[in-house]
A protein has these predicted regions:
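C-terminal regulatory or interaction extensions
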Residues: 1-68
Length: 68
C-alpha cells in the first residue's frame, strides 16, 4: 500500500522527466532534506516507482529522479 507521502510525490512528477531533489522538495513545499528522503524519496525508490539517473552514485550532485 502506498503511503500518502509517496502518492504526493508521484502526483507532482511527470513521466520521463528528470527532477532534482530540490525541485521536488519545492513542488511539495518541503524544507527538510532528511524528512523528504526518509518519507518520500526512499520509499518511492524501494517500490520501483521512482528511479535514479545515476544509480551507481546515489549521492552525486548531478543526481536526478524519474517517475517510472
Amino acid at each position: 500500500m502506498l503511503s500518502e507521502y509517496v502518492k504526493k510525490l508521484l502526483d507532482v512528477m511527470e513521466y520521463d522527466i528528470p527532477y532534482t531533489r530540490l525541485a521536488l522538495m519545492e513542488k511539495l513545499g518541503l524544507k527538510s532534506n532528511e524528512g523528504f528522503r526518509r518519507n518520500y524519496l526512499h520509499p518511492a525508490i524501494e517500490l520501483n516507482l521512482v528511479s535514479m539517473t545515476i544509480p551507481e552514485k546515489p549521492n552525486s550532485r548531478n543526481q536526478r529522479y524519474i517517475k517510472v
